[in-house]
Design a protein with these regions (language model features):
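N-terminal, active-site-proximal structural segment of metallo-dependent hydrolase catalytic domains
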Residues: 4, 16-82, 94-101, 119, ...
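Bacterial N-terminal signal peptides
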Residues: 6-14
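His/acidic metal-ligating clusters that form di-metal
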Residues: 23, 139-161, 168-191
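Active-site/binding-pocket entry motifs
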Residues: 36-38, 112-113, 123, 164
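Surface-exposed cleft-lining segments at the edges of enzyme active sites
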Residues: 39-42, 126-134, 161-171
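Preference for well-ordered, secondary-structure-rich cores of eukaryotic proteins
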Residues: 48, 82, 107-108, 113, ...
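Structured beta-strand-rich core segments of catalytic domains in phosphoester-bond hydrolases
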Residues: 65-159
């Protein structure tokens, strides 16, 4: 429930002004996309058979900004190669570089300028790279970006998270961390 609320807040909050006052070019399309890890155990649904579909879906829906989950380094590369019109940030949650899952953020480069970004781990120490905390099944992290819309000149805050699917305590504590990070990082920017 809290996870859904946070995700909704991250992608649906008011975009600076009432919808009726917005020109059509001020529309913002955002998406959260769990692409699923790359594993041969998925048989015909493995990543090598899904990667083109994933990129084509992003283009079909003309997404401005999206957060993806369960993205390994090779999948990150595949998305970057297939979506060269998008800028991206993302690091591996196990080493802060490329090892393990990434929770990247992608944005249309022609529309947005990246002003700032960062990462935090769902742990007692948010800077503890790769730490599994509380009763989580695996380490988890969040990514955030401050983007400036080149059309409207307005800034926004976007956060992408992937909360643990097993640990009840981990989910509750992660939700608290998300709210804390939103308050500390977003300031008065729309989320």
């Amino acid at each position: 429930m809290i996870r859904n609320l946070v995700l909704c807040a991250a992608v649906v909050s008011a975009w600076f002004s009432p919808a009726s006052a917005r020109p059509s070019n001020d529309e913002l399309k955002v998406m959260s996309f769990n692409i699923r890890i790359d594993t041969k155990a998925d048989g015909p649904n493995q990543w090598s058979n899904r990667r083109d579909f994933a990129a084509n879906m992003i283009r079909f829906y003309d997404i401005d900004i999206f957060g993806a989950q369960e993205v390994f380094a090779n999948q990150m590369t595949d998305l970057q190669e297939r979506l060269p019109e998008y800028g991206s940030i993302g690091i591996g949650l196990e080493d802060g570089k490329s090892k393990g899952q990434h929770d990247p953020i992608f944005w249309k480069k022609e529309r947005f300028e990246l002003l700032d970004h960062g990462f935090f781990w769902f742990a007692e120490d948010i800077n503890a790279i790769g730490q599994r905390a509380w009763d989580a099944a695996s380490p988890r992290m969040g990514s955030w970006a401050i983007l400036k819309d080149k059309i409207s000149k307005r800034k926004l805050f976007f956060m992408n998270v992937h909360i643990d699917h097993i640990g009840q305590v981990a989910r509750r504590e992660s939700a608290k961390l998300i709210l804390d990070r939103l308050g500390a990082l977003a300031g008065d920017l729309p989320v």
